[in-house]
Amino acid sequence: MSDFVNAISEAVKAGLSADWVTMGTSIADALAKGADFILGFFN
């Protein structure tokens, strides 16, 4: 779960500094980590 929080934090920091490429990749990373976390409950 901490990886998910870190990915969200990176996306927010990138957004605040208008680093759109980093923000986009951080959001994608957060979504992937969140999906992995949720799917972990079903395995």
UniProtKB/Swiss-Prot annotation:
Keywords: Cytolysis, Formylation, Hemolysis, Secreted, Toxin, Virulence
Keyword Iron-sulfur in record: no
PTM sites of type N-formylmethionine: 1
GO BP terms, alphabetized: killing of cells of another organism
InterPro entries registered for this protein in UniProt: PSMbeta
UniProt superkingdom: Bacteria
GO CC terms: extracellular region
GO molecular function, one term: toxin activity
Location within or outside the cell: Secreted
Primary site of residence: secreted
Described function: Virulence factor. Causes hemolysis of erythrocytes from sheep (HD(50)=2.63 mM), rabbit (HD(50)=2.37 mM), guinea pig (HD(50)=1.98 mM), dog (HD(50)=1.02 mM) and human (HD(50)=2.07 mM). Acts synergistically with beta-hemolysins from S.aureus ATCC 25923. Cytotoxic towards human dermal fibroblasts.
Protein family: Belongs to the staphylococcal hemolytic protein family.
The protein's name: Hemolysin H3C
Upper lineage: Bacteria, Bacillati, Bacillota, Bacilli, Bacillales
